[in-house]
Swiss-Prot record:
Native species: Enterococcus faecalis (strain ATCC 700802 / V583)
InterPro entries (UniProt xref): RpoY
Keyword flag Transcription: yes
EC number assigned by the record: 2.7.7.6
Family annotation (Pfam families): RpoY
Signal peptide span: none
NCBIfam families linked: PRK13667.1 (NF010188)
Top class in the EC scheme: transferase
Catalysis: reaction(s): RNA(n) + a ribonucleoside 5'-triphosphate = RNA(n+1) + diphosphate
Protein name, per record: DNA-directed RNA polymerase subunit epsilon
UniProt similarity note: Belongs to the RNA polymerase subunit epsilon family.
Function text: A non-essential component of RNA polymerase (RNAP).
């Protein structure tokens, strides 16, 4: 399953919508995705979204789609 993770680059500052970034990860569950991101980055995770087939196709066509691996 492919997940889209919305995050802020730092946990120190208050989150701002304009600074939200995203990355894509393949994993068996959102819990695993959250663990991997928390263990390997200083990011403040806002939301972990499971991408369905249509949403994934859209992201692959229209976004800077790259799977992140740790």
């Amino acid at each position: 399953m492919i997940y889209k993770v919305y995050y802020q680059e730092t946990k120190i500052r208050n989150p701002k919508r304009e600074d939200t970034k995203s990355l894509y990860m393949e994993a068996d569950s959102d819990v695993i995705v959250r663990q991997l991101v928390e263990e390997n980055t200083p990011y403040n995770i806002e939301y972990v979204q499971l991408l369905d087939e249509k949403h994934l196709a859209y992201e692959q066509e229209h976004a800077d789609f790259t799977l992140t691996e740790f």
